[in-house]
C-alpha cells in the first residue's frame, strides 16, 4: 500500500467500524488511546477523564469513546485515530481495518518519540514515558506529583490510585493545568513537575525525552532557545521544591510515606518442628534472650517518631518470618523505604527463628531485593545476633533456604545490611538494658538524624560500640555494607 493509497484507505474507515475497534482492545490500550486522542483539549480531557474513571469502577465496561471522538472531529478523526493506534502498537486492530503494519510504521514513525503528524507530540512522548516506567517508578511519580499538585491547588483530589494507568493521572494534571502541552509545536508547554521528578529520581532518559520533544518541535531557532531555557528553569525550580531532594546526591525520606519498620523479636525458642525440618534445627536448645524486649520497645519509640508504620512481632517461626517480610514488601509500592529488624540468636551468616531453625541471612537480603515494589528504594536489614564461627558439631546439618532469586545486579541497588557484629564473633546484650548495638543505634538516631545521613549515623554507631568494654573486657565491632547510590536521610522526628 503506497503512501497515497494509505491515505485513500484511511477514508474508507466508517464510524460503525469503531464499535469493533473498541471491542478488540483491552482497558490499558483504551486508556492509552484516549489519552492520545483527547488529551490536547481541556474540555475533551475533562470529559475522557471522567469516562475512564467510570470504566474503572465497572466490572463490564462498555463504551463508545471512539464514536464520540469521531463525531467531535468529523474532518480529521481518521488520521488522528490511525496514528494513535500506531503509537500504542495496536497491530491486531490495524490489521482488521485493512492496514499493513510496516507501511504504517514507515509513515507515522511510532517508534520515534516526539515526531508526529496529527497527535500532539508531547502526548506521544508522555505516552512513551508511561510505557517505559516500571510500576514502582510510576507509583513514585504519581505520589510525588500528586502531593505537589494538591498542595498548590484547591479542589477534590483524584480518587484513583492504580499507577498501572499513569495516563489517567496525566489527564487529571492536564485538566488542572498543573502540566500544559502548549500548542501543536509545544510552544507554551509546561512539564516542570514531571521533568524535575524524573531527574531527581535517576530517570534522565525520560526527562530528556520530554525536553527534546519541546525543543525539536519549536518552529524557529529563537523559539527553540526559549523553550530550552524554559525547560532549564523548570528543572531548577522543581529541584529546589522537590520533597525528596536536599542536594544532587541526597534522598530525604518523608514522614508521610516513610514506610514500614518490621521488627522480628525472638525472646523464647522451641524445637517443635516436623520431621522434615529437623535437619535445620540448632544442635542444642537455644537460651532465652532476656533484654531483647528493651531493644524492641526502643525501636518502636524511635521509628514511630519518624513516621514509620512499626509492626513488631514476638517469637516468630521461620515461615512466619518469610510471610511477614513478603507482606511488608507487597505493601511498599507507594512508600519511601522498608526497614527490617531481626533480634535473635545466630552464627556466621545465619540467624535463628523462634522454632530454632537456622536461616541464611543472604536469602533474607535477596528476598527484600526481589520485589519490584522496592526497586531503587532504600531497603534496610538490621540484625542483632551473634555471628560466631561454630565447629561442625555445633551447627545445624543444613540452613533453611528461602525460595527466592534475583536476576539482575540492579535489584540489589539501595540495599543496606547492618549487623551487630563482624563475622566470627558474639553480639553482646545486657539482660536488663538491652543490646549494645540497638541501644547505640537508637541513641545515634535521636541525636543525629536531623543532620546526618544513614551511613554516617551507622559510622557513629560503629565508633561508639567499638569503644565499649564489658565486665570481662569483652568488645564488639558492628559490620555495615551498603549499595546506596546517594546519601539517604531518615524522616524528621516529631
From Swiss-Prot:
Please name the GO terms of the biological process aspect recorded for this protein, alphabetically. apoptotic process; defense response; defense response to Gram-negative bacterium; execution phase of apoptosis; immune response; innate immune response; negative regulation of programmed cell death; peptidoglycan recognition protein signaling pathway
Instruction: Cite the SMART domains for this sequence.
Output: CASc
Please classify the protein's predominant subcellular localization into one broad category. Answer: cytoplasm
A GO molecular-function descriptor: cysteine-type endopeptidase activator activity involved in apoptotic process
The record's listing under InterPro entries reads:
Caspase-like_dom_sf (IPR029030), Dredd_2nd (IPR056260), Dredd_N (IPR056259), Pept_C14_caspase (IPR011600), Pept_C14_p10 (IPR002138), Pept_C14_p20 (IPR001309), Pept_C14A (IPR015917)
Q: Which GO terms describe its cellular component?
A: cytoplasm; cytosol
Tissue expression from the record: Constitutively expressed in fat bodies of larvae and adults.
Supply the Pfam families for this chain: Dredd_2nd (PF23724), Dredd_N (PF23725), Peptidase_C14 (PF00656)
Task: Tell me what this protein is called.
Answer: Caspase-8
- Species in which this protein is naturally found: Drosophila melanogaster (Fruit fly)
Provide the gene name from the record: Dredd
Amino acid at each position: 500500500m503506497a503512501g497515497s493509497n494509505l491515505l485513500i484507505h484511511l477514508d474508507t474507515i466508517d464510524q460503525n467500524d469503531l464499535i469493533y475497534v473498541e471491542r478488540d482492545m483491552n482497558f490499558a490500550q483504551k486508556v492509552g488511546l484516549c489519552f492520545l486522542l483527547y488529551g490536547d483539549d481541556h474540555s475533551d480531557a475533562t470529559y475522557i477523564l471522567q469516562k475512564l474513571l467510570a470504566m474503572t469502577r465497572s466490572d463490564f465496561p462498555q463504551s463508545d469513546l471512539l464514536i464520540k471522538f469521531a463525531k467531535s472531529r468529523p474532518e480529521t478523526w481518521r488520521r488522528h485515530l490511525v496514528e494513535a493506534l500506531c503509537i500504542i502498537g495496536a497491530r491486531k486492530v490495524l490489521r482488521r481495518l485493512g492496514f499493513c503494519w510496516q507501511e504504517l510504521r514507515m509513515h507515522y514513525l511510532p517508534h520515534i518519540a516526539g515526531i508526529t503528524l496529527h497527535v500532539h507530540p508531547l502526548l506521544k512522548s508522555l505516552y512513551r514515558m508511561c510505557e517505559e516506567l516500571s510500576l514502582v517508578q510510576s507509583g513514585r511519580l504519581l505520589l510525588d506529583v500528586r502531593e505537589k499538585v494538591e498542595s498548590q491547588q484547591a479542589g477534590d483530589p483524584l480518587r484513583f490510585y492504580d499507577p498501572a494507568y499513569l495516563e489517567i493521572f496525566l489527564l487529571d494534571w492536564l485538566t488542572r493545568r498543573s502540566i500544559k502541552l502548549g500548542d501543536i509545536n509545544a510552544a507554551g508547554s509546561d512539564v516542570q513537575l514531571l521533568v524535575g521528578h524524573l531527574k531527581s529520581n535517576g530517570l534522565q532518559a525520560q526527562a530528556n525525552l520530554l525536553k527534546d520533544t519541546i525543543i525539536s518541535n519549536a518552529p524557529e531557532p529563537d523559539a527553540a532557545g526559549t523553550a530550552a531555557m524554559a525547560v532549564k528553569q523548570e528543572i531548577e525550580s522543581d529541584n529546589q521544591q522537590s520533597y525528596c531532594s536536599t542536594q544532587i546526591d541526597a534522598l530525604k525520606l518523608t514522614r508521610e510515606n516513610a514506610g514500614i519498620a518490621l521488627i522480628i523479636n525472638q525472646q523464647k525458642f522451641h524445637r517443635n518442628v516436623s520431621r522434615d525440618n529437623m535437619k535445620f534445627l540448632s544442635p542444642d536448645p537455644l537460651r532465652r534472650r532476656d533484654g531483647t524486649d528493651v531493644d524492641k520497645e526502643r525501636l518502636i519509640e524511635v521509628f514511630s517518631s519518624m513516621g514509620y508504620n512499626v509492626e513488631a512481632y514476638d517469637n516468630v517461626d521461620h515461615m512466619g518470618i518469610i510471610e511477614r517480610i513478603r507482606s511488608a514488601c507487597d505493601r511498599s509500592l507507594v512508600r519511601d523505604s522498608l526497614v527490617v529488624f531481626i533480634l535473635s540468636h545466630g552464627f556466621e551468616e545465619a540467624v535463628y527463628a523462634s522454632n530454632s531453625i537456622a536461616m541464611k541471612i543472604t536469602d533474607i537480603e535477596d528476598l527484600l531485593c526481589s520485589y519490584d515494589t522496592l526497586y531503587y528504594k532504600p531497603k534496610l536489614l538490621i540484625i542483632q545476633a551473634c555471628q560466631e564461627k561454630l565447629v561442625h558439631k555445633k551447627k545445624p546439618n543444613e540452613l533453611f533456604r528461602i525460595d527466592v532469586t534475583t536476576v539482575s545486579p540492579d535489584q540489589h541497588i539501595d540495599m543496606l545490611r547492618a549487623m551487630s557484629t563482624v563475622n566470627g564473633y558474639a553480639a553482646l546484650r545486657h539482660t536488663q538494658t538491652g543490646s549494645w548495638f540497638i541501644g547505640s543505634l537508637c541513641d545515634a538516631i535521636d541525636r543525629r538524624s536531623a543532620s546526618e545521613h544513614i551511613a554516617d549515623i551507622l559510622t557513629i554507631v560503629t565508633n561508639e560500640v567499638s569503644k565499649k568494654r564489658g565486665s570481662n573486657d569483652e568488645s564488639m565491632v558492628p559490620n555495615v555494607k551498603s549499595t546506596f547510590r546517594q546519601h539517604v536521610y531518615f524522616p524528621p522526628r516529631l
